[in-house]
Swiss-Prot record:
GO molecular function: large ribosomal subunit rRNA binding; structural constituent of ribosome
Annotated coiled-coil segments of the chain: none
Gene3D superfamilies attached to this UniProt entry: 3.30.70.1730, 6.10.250.2350
PANTHER family: 39S RIBOSOMAL PROTEIN L10, MITOCHONDRIAL
Quaternary organization: Part of the ribosomal stalk of the 50S ribosomal subunit. The N-terminus interacts with L11 and the large rRNA to form the base of the stalk. The C-terminus forms an elongated spine to which L12 dimers bind in a sequential fashion forming a multimeric L10(L12)X complex.
Name of the featured protein: Large ribosomal subunit protein uL10
Organism for this UniProt entry: Shewanella piezotolerans (strain WP3 / JCM 13877)
Length: 165
């Protein structure tokens, strides 16, 4: 079904708005994925704070022009599904990577983060970024280990000092 000019402008504006507020983007090819599976992906995306849309290549190229995701323009070939992470940079990459494991026909093309193009084979770089809570927990564990190590060294020094006296 052909889209009218106003419909095309609305789609470009919607995707552009999503791109402006996004932290990262992932582009994929969803050929061969059933409607039911795509519905499940969209539901999971909403829960994860990820904007997912299947858009015509010419429209998505116009929508990302002038944003950090302009570097993805060469990946817009064939059927294009684009996902923008709004809350956490790795959310879209993690979501689509997990979906690709379940769906053998689903193929991730590339991702972008802070204006840098990330090829599909390096998508783990983005998907493995810790969330704020995970990073905070890792930091606290490091502090806890450091203070415990300091206590052990202090007690050992105290013991050595008493043995020497």
């Amino acid at each position: 079904m052909a889209l009218g000019l106003e419909d095309k402008k609305a789609i470009v504006a919607e995707v552009n708005e999503a791109a402006k507020g996004a932290l990262s983007a992932v582009v994929a090819d969803s050929r061969g994925v059933t409607v039911g599976d795509m519905t499940g992906l969209r539901k999971a995306a909403r829960e994860a704070g990820v904007y997912v849309k299947v858009v015509r290549n010419t429209l998505v190229k116009r929508a990302v022009a002038g944003t950090d995701f302009e570097c993805l323009a060469d990946t817009f070939t064939g059927p294009t599904l684009i996902a923008f992470s709004n809350e956490h940079p790795g959310a879209a990459a993690r979501l689509l990577k997990d979906f690709a494991k379940e769906q053998e026909k689903f193929e991730i093309k590339a991702a972008a983060f802070e204006g840098e193009l990330i090829p599909a084979d390096n998508i783990d770089r983005l998907a493995k970024l810790p969330t704020y809570e995970e990073a905070l927990a890792q930091f606290m564990m490091t502090l806890k280990e450091a203070s415990a190590g300091k206590l052990v060294r202090t007690l050992a020094a105290l013991r050595d000092q008493k043995e020497a006296a």
